[in-house]
Amino acid sequence: MATIKDVARLAGVSTTTVSHVINKTRFVAEATQEKVNKAVDELNYAPSAVARSLKCNTTRTIGMLVTQSTNLFFSEVIDGVESYCYRQGYTLILCNTGGIYEKQRDYIRMLAEKRVDGILVMCSDLTEELREMLDRHADIPKVIMDWGPESSQADKIIDNSEEGGYLATKYLIERGHSKIACLSGHLDKAACVERISGYKRALNEAKITADENMIIEGNFECDTAVIAADQIIEMEERPTAVFCFNDTMALGLMSRLQEKGIRIPEDISVIGYDNIELAEYFSPPLTTVHQPKRRVGKNAFEILLERIKDKDHEKRVFEMHPEIVERSTVKTLN
């Protein structure tokens, strides 16, 4: 592997000159630049990121902890983060924890050892232990996204899940629905608690009694949506509408209901949550609650860059507000 000394020898200049040409830290005559660049190309020389990080006290690297990168919502946020990292000359290290404590612990340790400039956290399974681990590395700038916990050591972006649950349920009520089921994720997750709170607030405003039997626990994946669809089919009094806590479950639910001869939205209306790309192209196209996923990714990265530049800045909370995207899966009854 070629070294900076090899480049300097081939170009007939000093190693200092080579460094200035590569890093653009001082004026170097054009003819000399051409010699150095030609030598770099001939030797296929790659500057040492380790050496540069020691000199500049930055690795131009960001770590990102996620629960599951294959989740369609997470993957679209990650895509936004990666895109903005690349544009700003940063490398993204993606750590897929699967919600496993040991992996979370080991990845945080690894990111600290690699001297990342900052960490983005987007995990649905965040425990007090994980928060303490993050707080232990107070010297590393952090931004917590989506379902993460409050931390004295990190900026936070919140998605206003309660507001989203309220908007989705109110949308159905305004179209004449009063028997509204909801298919949640795990009921102990903060986002689910908040969306159920919003669901109940909308029902209460409309003087509709919330029926706990209409709250079906899922896991944000298609398999539980299929089980939920079968439960709904067996109900003596079926709901006229179902509010699903993410689009993945909504699409799974619709697929199963249609397979059993139940038409969407003629027989049962469905509204989702997240507005993933696939939602628009399903049949029928899914009405859903929009979350600006790529903007969340962009904002998170920009906030983290600010924190990297000014570690002593007061910790902040940034709010994102959901909105309804109207398509073809909700029938108006009144």
Swiss-Prot record:
Keywords carried by this UniProt record: DNA-binding, Purine biosynthesis, Repressor, Transcription, Transcription regulation
UniProt-listed Pfam families: LacI (PF00356), Peripla_BP_3 (PF13377)
Domain HTH lacI-type per the UniProt entry, residue ranges: 2-56
PROSITE patterns registered for this protein in UniProt: HTH_LACI_1, HTH_LACI_2
Binding positions for hypoxanthine per the UniProt entry: 73, 189, 220, 274
Matching InterPro entries: HTH_LacI, LacI/GalR-like_sensor, Lambda_DNA-bd_dom_sf, Peripla_BP_I, Tscrpt_reg_HTH_PurR
Gene Ontology annotations of biological process type: negative regulation of DNA-templated transcription; purine nucleotide biosynthetic process
An example molecular function term from Gene Ontology annotations: transcription cis-regulatory region binding
Residue spans binding DNA: 4-23, 48-56
Pathway: Purine metabolism; purine nucleotide biosynthesis [regulation]
Keyword NADP listed: no
Domain comment (free text): Consists of two structural and functional domains: an N-terminal DNA-binding domain, approximately the first 60 residues, and a larger C-terminal domain, approximately 280 residues, which imparts the function of corepressor binding and oligomerization.
Assembly and binders: Homodimer.
Its biological purpose: Is the main repressor of the genes involved in the de novo synthesis of purine nucleotides, regulating purB, purC, purEK, purF, purHD, purL, purMN and guaBA expression. PurR is allosterically activated to bind its cognate DNA by binding the purine corepressors, hypoxanthine or guanine, thereby effecting transcription repression.
HAMAP family, alphabetized: HTH_type_PurR
Listed name of the protein: HTH-type transcriptional repressor PurR
Source species of the chain: Vibrio atlanticus (strain LGP32)
Gene name in the database record: purR
